[in-house]
Amino acid sequence: MKLLENSSFEAINSLLTIETGDCKIIGRIESYSCKMAGDDKQMFKQFCQEGQPHVLEALSPPQSSGISPNKLSHSLDDGEGPLSDKCSRKTLFYLIATLNESFRPDYDFSRTKGHDFSKEPSVNWVFNAVNSSLSAAAGEAYSHLQPQLWEALDKEISLAECDIYSYNPDLDSDPYGEEGNLWSFNYFFYNKRLKRIVFFTCRSVSLFMAPRDSGIGTELDLELDEGSYEEEEEGNMDEERYGALCA
């Protein structure tokens, strides 16, 4: 997978970091070529040892489907119902390789399976889901960005021709699984004709619960620390004055 340069995406990504007072939105959009070269070919060869490229892999139902755990269990046994959505192992490899490239070098998704992904119902559904999440969290800041974002996506990947997948991992496999993460989404817009994937990932992080090493909330911590230091200094000065008077 090769990251493709896109000046429109770079401009949008600079606007997809939004602080709202109690949380911070962090998002990015990236375009990848599915043409394999070098390490990708070797990884694909190893991947195919578990099954041929044309073999279909079962996916999980979209999170929007509202399927009960009991019904989901039956679907696993029957191979029908909500898990009827499938993709070829070659497509699955593209999704995993995109994750590896996007989150490199901090995460390795080589053990990721088909059930960690879902195929979304339609472009319109994803459009509404993304807009709903970002509008609720970022308000006017996102409403100004929304037309530009979807226009750039359509120009790069031709949305009407896309199959859209999402990555919905368990907590242990989630790159956004740290304390303080409020919500996240990971969408892959795959255009088979163009041999291209656009990856749109976004999360919302609480400024009050962010881990120390995240860098989020650091300014607030510094202000509080400075305030405590000033109070301590004032206390020491009072003690010195009191000691001088007693002497």
From Swiss-Prot:
Belongs to the MAF1 family. Residues 238-247 have a biased composition (Basic and acidic residues). Residues 61-73 have a biased composition (Polar residues). Residues 225-237 have a biased composition (Acidic residues). Transmembrane segments: none annotated. This is Repressor of RNA polymerase III transcription MAF1 homolog. Element of the TORC1 signaling pathway that acts as a mediator of diverse signals and that represses RNA polymerase III transcription. Inhibits the de novo assembly of TFIIIB onto DNA. GO terms for cellular component: cytoplasm; nucleus. Keywords: Cytoplasm, Nucleus, Repressor, Transcription, Transcription regulation. It comes from Danio rerio (Zebrafish). GO terms for biological process: negative regulation of transcription by RNA polymerase III. GO terms for molecular function: RNA polymerase III core binding. The lineage of its organism: Eukaryota, Metazoa, Chordata, Craniata, Vertebrata. It is found in: Nucleus; Cytoplasm. The keyword Glycosyltransferase does not apply. InterPro entries: Maf1, Maf1_sf. Residues 59-83, 225-247 are annotated as: Disordered.
